Amino acid sequence: MSDAPTVVAYLGPAGTFTEEALYKFADAGVFGDGEIEQLPAKSPQEAVDAVRHGTAQFAVVAIENFVDGPVTPTFDALDQGSNVQIIAEEELDIAFSIMVRPGTSLADVKTLATHPVGYQQVKNWMATTIPDAMYLSASSNGAGAQMVAEGTADAAAAPSRAAELFGLERLVDDVADVRGARTRFVAVQAQAAVSEPTGHDRTSVIFSLPNVPGSLVRALNEFAIRGVDLTRIESRPTRKVFGTYRFHLDISGHIRDIPVAEALRALHLQAEELVFVGSWPSNRAEDSTPQTDQLAKLHKADEWVRAASEGRKLN
């Protein structure tokens, strides 16, 4: 009897850029060397929840793009507790094909469907080339192609492979308002021990702070005084009390790097809540190990770092 396939959830249907990222992760061995079963999801939340609920062993989701910045639905999906973590990342060059049902010309296009993030990357092309066409929001770029196949949109901006999958004709290829635009994707699994540091790693956490003057400055200063670079910080509403926020932080370095560990210990002491989202190899050279010889000796914060790196419950 053969082993069951490894289930990987992703933003579907087939023909999305997320599916292309899934293939890159698979080629890199992120999901192991066994058979892979793809599980299309309707949203990043649904994909990540598939891992939380044990329906999938992994999920692949977009987290940041060159044109429109952070993919906030992914941040919200990760901010649901500490039982999933990011283990790898990949970047894709993003350019779209404009696809239609066979026999349709650009002059016939009155509606174009694509994901809202995709629309931000083709809207100038639309304004110039098909100025009278209306944009229709789709749950993914692949779903936009499906809408064309089903007759609910005249055209879609999607990866070229989607045309083959849905029996469409590509009228224009390599459409992108910003040349060289890229999107970063991450692979997510259930909480477990982190991989060993590589010297070029990225760590991500989510935290909330007391709503008092200076709390965020004091928290971020813990990283500055230890020479730890912050590559991204985003705020998202807590959805509990109006005007209160949780912060998503990307850090250059690994949780087992001493400067990063020190800074996270100090942040743990200040935060109302601190969620570990993962430490993983970065594909960017600037995410290098910080250099410092400072040591922290606070037992409670030490225990938090050990628990995070060993895959145990975080207190």
From Swiss-Prot:
Catalytic reactions of this protein: prephenate + H(+) = 3-phenylpyruvate + CO2 + H2O
Higher taxonomy: Bacteria, Bacillati, Actinomycetota, Actinomycetes, Mycobacteriales
Database matches in SUPFAM superfamilies: ACT-like, Periplasmic binding protein-like II
Domain of life where this protein originates: Bacteria
GO terms under cellular component: cytoplasm
Protein name (database record): Prephenate dehydratase
Keyword Transit peptide in record: no
Pathway in which the depicted protein is active: Amino-acid biosynthesis; L-phenylalanine biosynthesis; phenylpyruvate from prephenate: step 1/1
GO BP annotations listed: L-phenylalanine biosynthetic process
Alphabetical list of Gene3D superfamilies matching this protein: 3.30.70.260, Periplasmic binding protein-like II
Enzyme class, first EC level, given as a word: lyase
Record-annotated ACT domain positions: 204-283
Single annotated GO MF: prephenate dehydratase activity
Site (Essential for activity): T183
Pfam family, one: ACT
Record key words, sorted: Amino-acid biosynthesis, Aromatic amino acid biosynthesis, Lyase, Phenylalanine biosynthesis
EC number: 4.2.1.51
InterPro entries: ACT-like_dom_sf (IPR045865), ACT_dom (IPR002912), Chor_mutase/pphenate_deHydtase (IPR008242), Preph_deHydtase (IPR001086), Preph_deHydtase_CS (IPR018528)
Prephenate dehydratase domain boundaries: 7-190
